[in-house]
């Protein structure tokens, strides 16, 4: 396993935390990446639909989380409006997101505002993260922070990370790791605060961290300490959330939505493309066998399914169960110079089966884009085309 930190001339974090240019500890991967990966692992485990990052800064964590398929609403809040506007475009969908839409809708919103202000648009969230945030709050804001985040917003889970001051003596000439930090807590101080807050607002909490100490200094604990708070009894009910009065104090500075299969136009584009590709693959694979059969069966329909289950040279690899399902489905056939692929055959392929629940659904979506047989039970295409002749299929 790769070492988590090295002795070298560098900074603590590679992101925000300042250390004099002397011999210092460099974490590998950098400490900020370890923190973000910790959150991503939690998201992978718990699959929250609505996630907010308070004090989102340059939106690095949001950019890491936006690829997670379970998230449908991703929100960032920060006091620095210029930074939000500058980094907002990095959260917008790229061309690849349109070519391969997500399964579920995703909306991303960046709000300018203070984390100690109440805004009802953040009610009912599954996860709220506060990564290296609380140490930037003055005493007044720190006192209000639990009332807003734990009491008012009351999400199912809250993750709070903060520097562990017991680790600081391992850095040269460090009192506070950042000039903007108002305080840095020992493990006992953080855990005392966290347990008090958890007890007051009906949460349970467990403690961990990232940034392991070097050999011989294990007693100082992690460089970054983390509290994972979970609401006792699960998430707030929709009824409880709806009882809250609307309070919109934050200013939305960036909003974007991602294409998804839940949106009719993108679902149709994906389904038509998948059907077309599968039909073309079956047609091309039939051409060599067609030449062998020519002259033997006249103009009668020819079953060209073959005796073996499909094993593509490129593309998806099927399990034995999937192969059996495909092989047992109605087989493609030819009538004259036309090639027919039954919709039931197409539905046997995993990717198409995942998109469509049944034959009727597939037919209704593709009917105005792909030619179908007279009874609508199969896709129809020309058996041979210009390109086949050019490449001598």
UniProtKB/Swiss-Prot annotation:
Residues 283-309 are annotated as: Disordered. Keywords: Cytoplasm, Magnesium, Metal-binding, Methyltransferase, RNA-binding, RNA-mediated gene silencing, S-adenosyl-L-methionine, Transferase. Mg(2+) binds at residues 132, 135-136, 181. It catalyses: small RNA 3'-end nucleotide + S-adenosyl-L-methionine = small RNA 3'-end 2'-O-methylnucleotide + S-adenosyl-L-homocysteine + H(+). GO terms for cellular component: nucleus; P granule. GO terms for molecular function: metal ion binding; O-methyltransferase activity; RNA binding; RNA methyltransferase activity; small RNA 2'-O-methyltransferase activity. Pfam families: Methyltransf_23. Its cofactor is Mg(2+). Belongs to the methyltransferase superfamily. HEN1 family. This is Small RNA 2'-O-methyltransferase.
């Amino acid at each position: 396993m790769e070492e988590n930190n090295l002795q070298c001339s560098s900074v603590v974090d590679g992101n925000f935390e300042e250390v004099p240019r002397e011999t210092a500890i460099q974490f590998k991967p950098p400490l900020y990446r370890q923190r973000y990966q910790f959150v991503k692992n939690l998201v992978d485990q718990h699959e929250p639909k609505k996630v907010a990052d308070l004090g989102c800064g340059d939106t690095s964590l949001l950019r890491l989380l936006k690829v997670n398929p379970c998230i449908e609403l991703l929100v960032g809040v920060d006091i620095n409006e210029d930074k939000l506007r500058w980094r907002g475009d990095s959260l917008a969908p790229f061309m690849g997101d349109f070519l391969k839409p997500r399964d579920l809708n995703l909306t991303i919103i960046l709000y300018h505002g203070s984390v100690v202000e109440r805004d009802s648009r953040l009610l009912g969230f599954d996860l709220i993260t506060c990564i290296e945030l609380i140490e930037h709050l003055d005493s007044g804001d720190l006192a209000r922070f639990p009332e807003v985040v734990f009491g008012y917003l009351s999400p199912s889970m809250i993750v709070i990370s903060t520097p562990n001051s017991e680790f600081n003596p391992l850095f040269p000439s460090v009192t506070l790791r950042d000039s903007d930090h108002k305080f840095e807590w020992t493990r006992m101080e953080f855990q005392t605060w966290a347990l008090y807050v958890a007890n007051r607002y009906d949460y349970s909490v467990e403690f961990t961290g990232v940034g392991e100490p070097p050999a011989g200094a294990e007693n100082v604990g992690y460089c970054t300490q983390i509290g994972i708070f979970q609401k006792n009894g699960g998430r707030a009910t929709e009824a409880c959330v709806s009882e809250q009065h609307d309070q919109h104090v934050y200013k939305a500075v960036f909003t974007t939505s991602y294409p998804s299969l839940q949106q009719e136009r993108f679902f149709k584009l994906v389904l038509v493309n998948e059907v077309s590709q599968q039909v073309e693959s079956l047609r091309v694979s039939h051409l060599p066998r067609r030449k062998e059969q020519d002259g033997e069966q006249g103009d009668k329909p020819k079953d060209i399914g073959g005796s073996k289950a499909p094993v593509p040279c490129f593309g998806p690899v099927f399990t034995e169960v999937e192969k059996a399902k495909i092989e047992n489905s109605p087989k493609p056939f030819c009538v004259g110079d036309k090639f027919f692929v039954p919709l039931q055959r197409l539905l046997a392929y995993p990717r198409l089966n995942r998109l469509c629940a049944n034959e009727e659904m597939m037919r209704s979506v593709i009917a105005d884009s792909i030619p179908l047989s007279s009874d609508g039970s199969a896709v129809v295409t020309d058996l041979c085309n210009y390109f086949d002749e050019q490449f001598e299929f």
